[in-house]
Amino acid sequence: MFVHLLVLLFAAVEAIPTGRFEVVYPSMVTFRSGIKRIRFRALDEDIELRLEPAGDVIADDFTVINGENGEVDHSVNIQSLKRKLYKDAKVGAALHIDEDGSLIINGIVNSKLRIEPDTSKKASRNGIIAHRVIEVIEDEQLFHDVIILPPGLTRTFNYSEPLPDDKCVKIEYVFVTESSFTKSFQISSMETYLANMMNMVKIMFDSLDLGIEVAIIGIIKLTKENEAKLAPYIPLCSREMDSRETLDDMAEFYCNSADKLIQNADIVTLITTRPLGTFDENGYFFNIHLGIAFLDNICVYCYKYAIVKEDTGIYQLANTVAHESAHLLGCDHDGEKGSLDCSARDGYIMSWNNEKIGKKFSPCCKKRVEELITRRKINHCIVETCDGKRKRN
């Protein structure tokens, strides 16, 4: 079905837990503006976050699908989830803050620290329960990134006319969680985890300065019981997942699907923790891929798909989701084809070595995305009339 394959080597900066953590009792103040200030000291570092509401990454009609036959889970309180999401874009924090009872904070503090409630501590201090602040380090590892060029793709590199001021760009996601990923959330909430992850993706997209909004409209939770029925494109006989073959089968399956959730999504992404890579001619598997996506096809129904691997946690997952989404929006790797003017050594998200500026997109990627969103024949799924809160500058 798909004939062109680009495999490019890049050094992914991953967040690896160091084993260091400290128990803290964070203080929080909420101002009239809705901004929350959180302070604590951990691992010899004074932390102060100024957090703004960030519930827009969850759609008002957010839908969770699970169960043997893919039923809608009506137990999810959408407005409660949205109300508890906050971010500090300046430092790269994305948190779920639960004040229904004792204060519970969960999520990303910055690129080096995570916070979660400490369930081993029963006592509280001045009504504040204990939290663990966990240190992670950035570890450079080599992985391959895969881009598939659908047959008949004709790429242009010219601007069209700018978007009218009353038009905004919003990318709506559906995440399909492969059973190994779903299983890891027997205790903690997947919805909270993916919402915090999506806020990190939003912070990364903000570096494009194009006013792009992102939102999760649905999660399809796969389990061992429903995976074969709801996602027959996922291999059953082998734990290893051939990235190209799986994406090919995934696209073909959903291309013929009448599922309204899939139809309404701008990007459909499979999340897995299984080994993702390729087999050689002797059947040896190389576990070397973090992601795979179609290039320049966000609004093409049969090609709006990607696969990402969660390898070392939420920050790496956010980076990979942003990276593969940018491919669908038309971005090449820095230093390649449409991004020749940006060196891969600069270290942006789309470079082979993103340890320097790994939270931002390069000027070349911005140019390609800007070209896509101004091409009326291509941008129809992500450009919409702005609401009162989202007027473009």
From Swiss-Prot:
Family of the protein in this entry: Belongs to the venom metalloproteinase (M12B) family.
Tell me the segments the record calls region Disintegrin-like domain: 378-393
Source taxonomy: Eukaryota, Metazoa, Ecdysozoa, Arthropoda, Chelicerata
A cellular component term from Gene Ontology for this protein is:
extracellular region
Coarsely, its chief localization is secreted
What SUPFAM superfamilies does the record point to?
A: Metalloproteases ('zincins'), catalytic domain
Which residues are the active-site ones? E324
Q: Where is the Peptidase M12B domain?
A: 167-377
- Asked if the keyword Glycoprotein belongs to this entry, the reply reads yes
Where found in the cell? Secreted
| Required cofactor names | Zn(2+)
- Gene Ontology biological-process annotations: membrane protein ectodomain proteolysis
In alphabetical order, the GO MF annotations are: metal ion binding; metalloendopeptidase activity; toxin activity
Q: Which organism is it from?
A: Olivierus martensii (Manchurian scorpion)
Cofactor annotation remark: Binds 1 zinc ion per subunit.
Q: Which residues are glycosylated?
A: N158
Q: What does UniProt give as the signal peptide span?
A: 1-15
Keywords, alphabetical: Disulfide bond, Glycoprotein, Hydrolase, Metal-binding, Metalloprotease, Protease, Secreted, Signal, Toxin, Zinc
Write down the Pfam families for this protein, in alphabetical order. Reprolysin_5
Provide the free-text tissue specificity comment from this protein's UniProt record. Answer: Expressed by the venom gland.
The UniProt record lists the EC number as 3.4.24.-
Entries under PROSITE patterns matching the protein = ADAM_MEPRO
What PTMs does it carry? Contains several disulfide bonds.
Reported function: Metalloprotease.
Protein name in UniProt: Venom metalloproteinase BumaMPs1
Q: Does the keyword Ubl conjugation apply?
A: no
Record: residues binding Zn(2+) = H323, H327, H333
